[in-house]
Structure formats: C-alpha cells, structure tokens
Design a protein with these regions (language model features):
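A short helix-loop-beta-strand connector motif used in the catalytic cores of GNAT acetyltransferases and
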Residues: 57-71, 88-92, 122
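Conserved GNAT acetyl-CoA-binding A-motif
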Residues: 119-121, 133, 149-161
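Conserved acyl-CoA
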Residues: 111-116, 129, 140-155
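Conserved beta-strand in the GNAT
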Residues: 71, 77-86, 122, 127
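Conserved acetyl-CoA-binding loop-helix of GNAT-fold acetyltransferases
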Residues: 134-147, 169-173
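Conserved acyl-donor/pantetheine-binding loop and adjacent beta-alpha core of acyl/acetyltransferases
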Residues: 86-125
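Conserved GNAT-fold acetyl-CoA-binding loop/helix
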Residues: 34-57, 67-68, 102-104
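Conserved N-terminal entry element of GNAT/NAT acetyltransferase domains
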Residues: 1-20, 40, 195
C-alpha cells in the first residue's frame, strides 16, 4: 500500500458527498449492514428504511451524515461509498442518530458496546455496487481512509462480521489487524485496527 491515496484509478473518481446524495448514502449504508441488496428490488420494508434514513443523512452531528461520506463515481454515476468519522463524539452522534430512526430501542442501544472512541477514525460503512466489485474500488477507499487517519495522527478502525470472511480478508490485505471484539446490533463483531 502506498503512502499517498489514489485520486483516480482507471475510470473511477472520488468526491465528497453532498446533501443531495442522501438517497444514495442511505441505500449504501443499509447495503453495508446487509439490510438491502443493491442489485435487487427493495421490499416495502426496505424502502421504508431508506426513506427513514435519508433525512438523517442530510444532517450534521449524526453518524450517517453526508459530511462523513466519500463517494466513488464511474462516468459520473455513483457506485460506491465509504463513511467514516472521528470517534470522540460517537455516543452523542449515536444517540442523536437513533432518536430519529425506528431501528433500535434505547435499551438495545444502551446494551451495545461503543464501536469507536476518541483517537480513532472509525470506518462505519463501506459498500460497492455488485457490478463494480473486484476492481479495487473498496481497497482504494480503505487506503484513502487510512491515509486520512495517518494525517490526523490517529488509528483507523472498523468492525467486521465474523460471518464475512471475504471482507475480513480485504481489510487484512489493507493492513488492518484484529484487536478484540465489539458487540453491536446483535452481532459479536471482530474489531480491526490500522495503526
């Protein structure tokens, strides 16, 4: 992995998200959580989840804010997204986020471990449209996030589902190593760190 992030590889480019990307970000966050599949029609319940998340994405001071997202485009069409943020405001942002979403009760949230903490750049969500997987987009997004963390002099962290060995292999190829477990959203995730 190089010290400098790639700004354009082959035919894909990177850009910061805007509030106008709310629908795209909502879909890709939900895809990262395996709630929807990007190449399949959405059920009514899945569409309701997207619709509920969109206004949250348009805000600042929440976990899934457009301000935390970087989008990859191919021929001006968005095809991938990585959402990351510094960990110091995690609890405040989580509370503000889930007060607006019908996904979890306060008791469920209180029983979850913190996904991140101060001194970290937490990679919350990463999703690539299935048509564009396997061509290096996810790796480039991860490299850019690691570069950002290094520029801030903090570690990059993420969680991976133990039932997703392909994702874990990608993260390990990018230099992430396992450091414990985190219980969140009903899953005992592996916590991976890049220092």
């Amino acid at each position: 992995m190089s010290d400098q992030p790639l700004t354009s590889v082959l035919e894909f480019t990177f850009r910061a998200a805007t509030p106008d990307d709310a629908s795209f970000i909502a879909r890709y966050v939900l895809a990262a959580f395996h709630i929807i599949e990007l190449d399949k029609p959405f059920s009514e319940e899945q569409q309701q989840s997207i619709t509920a998340l969109e206004p949250v994405v348009q805000q600042e001071g929440v976990l899934y804010s457009y301000r935390h997202a970087e989008i990859v485009e191919i021929k001006r069409e968005p095809v991938a997204m990585l959402l990351s943020y510094k960990g110091e405001n995690f609890r405040e942002f989580r509370a503000r986020t889930f007060q607006q979403l019908p996904f979890f009760t306060e008791e469920e949230l209180a029983s979850m471990d913190d996904e991140t903490q101060a001194g970290e750049l937490y990679i919350d969500s990463l999703a690539v449209h299935p048509q564009h997987r396997g061509c290096g987009i996810a790796q480039c997004l991860l490299e850019r996030a690691v570069h950002r963390a290094k520029s801030l002099d903090i570690a990059a962290t993420l969680l991976v589902d133990p039932e997703n060995p392909k994702a874990r292999a990608l993260y390990e190829r990018c230099g992430f190593t396992a450091e414990g477990r985190v219980n969140a959203f009903g899953v005992n995730f592996h916590r991976l760190v890049h220092r």
